[in-house]
Amino acid sequence: STGVGNGIAIPHSKISLIDKTKVLFLKLKSAVDFSAPDKKDVDLVFVILAPKNCQSEHLLVLSSISSFIKNKSFVEKLRKLKNSKEIYNFFGQT
């Protein structure tokens, strides 16, 4: 499962169609089941797409996101963001 708990999921995949790692952040209007270990539905999703030949960068990005989401203040701020402009500005500062 890519559900990591506390309403957060980090689905990740390596694909041949890209040459740089991409991270997408989704703040869902309605939480969904990601089979998280704590059984909580997910409302915050970080999607990682990495090139097939880029194992180290893929793991580094996954590790970085994992570190950020351990910070309760960071997660609380994410949940308070109301629109795409606020999300963009938030990640521009982080």
Which residues make up each language-model segment?
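Cytosolic covalent-transfer regions centered on His/Cys nucleophiles
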Residues: S1-T94
